[in-house]
Regions:
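Conserved catalytic cores of very large enzyme subunits
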Residues: 108, 114-550
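Charged, amphipathic alpha-helical regulatory modules used
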Residues: 3, 8-122
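Intrinsically disordered, low-complexity segments
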Residues: 1-4, 10, 260-263, 267
């Protein structure tokens, strides 16, 4: 008796009835056996190798595969293993093509299964790592869902088709973690530190127009957020301002000079003078170059006004300058409020993400820079909305520098005060020590600022000079992604204008655990010190190897 598989197949007498054979598919479903499916798959491998019109050999291989069936049920994977075995016996090149095709099908199948599971979670807005991974993205909004869909699909594409296999496997196994896989195909940079002074002075272009130099603290703060928002679509990481106090100080001075001009012009007009406000503005800009002019500068300014025919006495001028100062402080506070509110509400990338923003400050000792820091800290404590919610952005970093914002003597003096409020009222040698105290108070209430210690040996720059008005160029600044970019193999050591490409994390806890296990197997005695030393050596060698691999 024979089993009729196809017109080409004649199986032996001991062959089971093929009509009784049941195929178990990968999803557990069952279906009747079909020899034609094996024939078709082998035929495609032959064609892919460039071998055509090989029907006889294909049918012979199919028959050999079927002869291996020993049970009435068999899995798809088992059949494919048999096909590979038989192909390797007669046509190794065809076998390679079959194996590659099989792997590709497995990859596609796995991708569809995993991606569907991920997509289902996004649709249902599950509280998982995917939907909660970005603090600056709302995954429950339609735009957020669309961005998450795109992100997960692109990660999968990058992992399967762009990354070299060894790195993809290391990432999947958890030996390393390659960040920002979703932006890997776009070839964009990750984070950057802006030189706002350069952008403000030269102006910059957005999609629909150019921006000129701002002329008030409100404009400075607003344009800073616009710069953040504009560049958000040019890269995929966070953005930072390395010297926020220095960059905003010019805006404070301009607002003060405008306030003096406005109040003084109004006062002179009330006294019956015919005032050309532009001329007054020029005089103010030339002589009042700080918001707290010294008695000598005030006297010179008063003399100039009298020479120009304006009868203003000393008390009247002091009143005008005090009014201008208070107006400037109020404007600066509103500018800092607006800055914080904008960075927590303005959506840019994909219409859904707020900017992942950071600002560094703390070392500008000018009256204007100090006012910026002071009002920023006040606005941070006040928080967002009517309930004073803690603002997530911008991430704030206060730069601590000995002799500028800290000294041991000042610290000891402050510790003698009853509380921090009393300590902040005192005077100190370090000009910004009172702001450091206020920053500590703000951190206790609003989580930010963080603190960066510039006197740590690896954070120092030999070019830093207290008398340099642009000393911020030589101060370390960090980005919200906790990235420290300072050293430079190809240029000047600075954080200004620097950024990074996306990074890879090494799984050091795993390396440490593995090193400990290996050490315990190598050292047979119970000498804990010897085991510890061997584990350290193995760990350091593993770190070196992994570093070379990355």
């Amino acid at each position: 008796m024979t089993c009729n598989v196809s017109p080409f197949f004649n199986l032996s007498m001991n062959c089971m009835n093929l009509n009784e054979i049941c195929i178990i598919k990968r999803d557990g479903k069952r279906e009747n056996f079909s020899a034609a499916k094996i024939t078709n798959a082998i035929g495609k491998a032959f064609v892919a190798t460039g071998l055509e019109h090989q029907e006889a050999m294909i049918n012979e291989i199919t028959q050999r595969v079927i002869e291996h069936f020993a049970e009435p049920t068999i899995t798809v994977e088992a059949i494919q293993d048999l096909v590979e075995t038989e192909l390797m016996k007669v046509q190794p090149e065809v076998a390679k093509k079959y194996i590659i095709y099989r792997q590709w099908r497995n990859t596609e199948r796995d991708r569809k299964t995993q991606i569907k599971h991920i997509m289902d979670g996004i649709v249902a807005i599950d509280k998982n790592d995917i939907n909660l991974s970005n603090a600056n993205m709302s995954s429950h909004t339609p735009a957020g869902q669309m961005m998450t869909f795109a992100s997960e699909i692109t990660k999968d594409y990058t992992y399967k088709y762009l990354l070299p296999k060894k790195y993809a496997e290391a990432h999947q196994l958890g030996d390393i973690h390659i960040h920002d896989l979703d932006y890997y195909p776009t070839k964009t940079t990750t984070c950057i530190q802006y030189d706002l002074d350069d952008l403000f002075e030269r102006g910059f272009h957005t999609k629909n127009g150019s921006i000129r130099t701002p002329q008030s603290i409100q404009s400075y703060a607003t344009l800073a957020t616009i710069i953040f928002q504009t560049n958000q679509n040019e890269q995929h990481g966070g953005q930072a301002i390395p010297a926020f106090d220095f960059f905003m100080a010019k805006g404070v001075l301009k607002s003060y000079q405008k306030a003096v001009t406005s109040i003084l012009s109004f006062f002179l007009e009330m006294k019956g003078y015919n005032v050309a406000e532009n001329d007054v503005q020029k005089t103010v800009n030339q002589q009042l170059t700080t918001i707290i002019p010294s008695a000598e500068i005030q006297k010179e300014f008063l003399t100039t006004l009298n020479k120009e025919g304006f009868n203003v006495n000393e008390d009247e001028l002091k009143h005008i300058l005090n009014k201008a100062y208070e107006r400037t402080r109020k404007d600066t506070h509103q500018a800092m409020e607006g800055f914080i509110h904008n960075l927590n509400t303005m959506h840019s990338r994909g219409g859904n993400q707020v900017v992942f923003s950071s600002i560094n400050y703390g070392t500008d000792t000018s009256a204007e820079g100090r006012m910026v820091i002071d009002e920023l800290l006040k606005a941070t404590i006040e928080g967002l909305g009517t309930r004073g919610e803690v603002p997530v952005f911008p991430i704030q970093i206060f730069k601590v520098k000995d002799g500028v914002s800290y000294s041991e003597k000042d610290f000891e003096k402050a510790m003698k005060a009853e509380n921090i409020e009393e300590a902040m009222k005192d005077s100190y040698e370090a000009p910004n020590f009172d702001l450091l105290l206020k920053a500590c108070q703000t951190t206790a209430k609003a989580l930010f600022p963080n603190f960066m210690f510039l006197d740590t040996p690896f954070n120092q720059n030999e070019k830093w000079d207290i008398n340099d008005p642009k000393r911020y160029k030589y101060e370390l600044a960090t980005m919200g992604c906790r990235t420290r970019v300072f050293e430079n193999l190809n240029g000047e050591k600075t954080s200004l204008g620097r950024g990074n490409l996306s990074f890879t994390t090494m799984n050091m806890p795993r390396l440490a655990i593995e090193a400990r296990i290996k050490a315990e197997n190598i050292i047979e005695s119970n000498n804990s010190d010897a085991i510890e030393q061997e584990a350290c050596n193995l760990f350091l060698e593993s770190v070196r190897e992994m570093s070379r691999f990355i």
